[in-house]
Regions:
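Conserved, structured core segments of small domains
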Residues: 1-257
């Protein structure tokens, strides 16, 4: 079963502070173990929301706001996609999350992958060789009451989403993407001084949750926003829908620090 591990943002990540050598080494070793176990599917770090943008659709009309997202209570600083035989297996792995991360005071949210409407995801194909001047951006579809209830658009709309994904992937724009099941099957793991505590879903704050994501390459934040404005997100014509656009870290960002 596929899962998405969401590493919640904190004051340090929102300030744009880069992880130190100890954390980079610890996370690298942890991910290497996941890969050796055949579980690691991909993962990325997100830059501070000040380098992103937020789109709000209301009655089909979009409003774009530049970051930072000061109103949001729950932001994402990174994610890891894994394949696990069971929830219990994954929980055992997560209990070994590197204590170097936030001095052992990290918050994780684990979501079951897979679009409830059956739209096929786009799997990552390793680190892409980005064209000169391009960056990668993550498009985060926020949940709402409909997605949390497992309500999906009609087959025609789902077909539009699938076609858009296929065309963007063939064009080399869409690098990765997946829907997420409602939070009823999710859990959170909060570490306090390295000791984990677990809370099962569902989680009440629907607008702070994710319903799906896409990773694209674009020349600029504006180009990424334009791509998102053209995407047929579920219920964008009839409901209040929010989409975050976040800049991803590249290896060069750490080398330049």
């Amino acid at each position: 079963m596929q899962y998405m591990i969401l590493r919640k943002a904190d004051a340090s990540t929102e300030a744009g502070e880069l992880p130190g050598p100890a954390l980079l080494a610890a996370m690298g070793a942890y991910n290497e173990e996941l890969a050796k176990a055949g579980m690691l599917l991909g993962g990325e770090g997100l830059q501070a929301s000040s380098k992103g943008a937020l789109i709000r659709f209301s009655g089909g009309k979009p409003t774009v706001t530049d970051g930072p997202f000061t109103e949001a209570k729950e932001l994402i600083a990174g994610f890891t996609m894994v394949e696990a035989a069971s929830r219990q297996e994954l929980m055992e792995w997560l209990q070994r999350w590197p204590k170097e991360d936030a001095d052992g005071n990290t918050s994780l949210e684990v979501r079951e992958g897979g679009c409830p409407g059956g739209v096929r995801g786009v799997a990552a194909k390793g680190a892409p060789a980005l064209p000169e001047g391009f960056r990668r951006f993550m498009i985060l579809l926020k949940a709402n009451d409909r997605t949390e209830a497992g309500i999906v658009p009609d087959s025609e709309w789902l077909g539009r989403m699938a076609q858009h994904n296929d065309e963007a992937a063939r064009a080399g724009v869409l690098l990765m993407g997946e829907g997420l099941k409602p939070s009823a099957s999710a859990f959170r793991m909060k570490f306090t001084r390295g000791k984990p505590g677990v809370m099962d879903g569902p989680f009440a704050e629907a607008k702070e949750l994710l319903a799906g994501f896409w990773v694209i390459q674009a020349r600029s934040l504006q180009a990424a926003v334009d791509w998102a404005l053209g995407y047929p997100f579920p219920f964008r014509e009839t409901e209040e829908v929010e989409v975050e656009i976040r800049l991803l870290y590249e290896a060069a960002d750490f080398a330049a620090a």
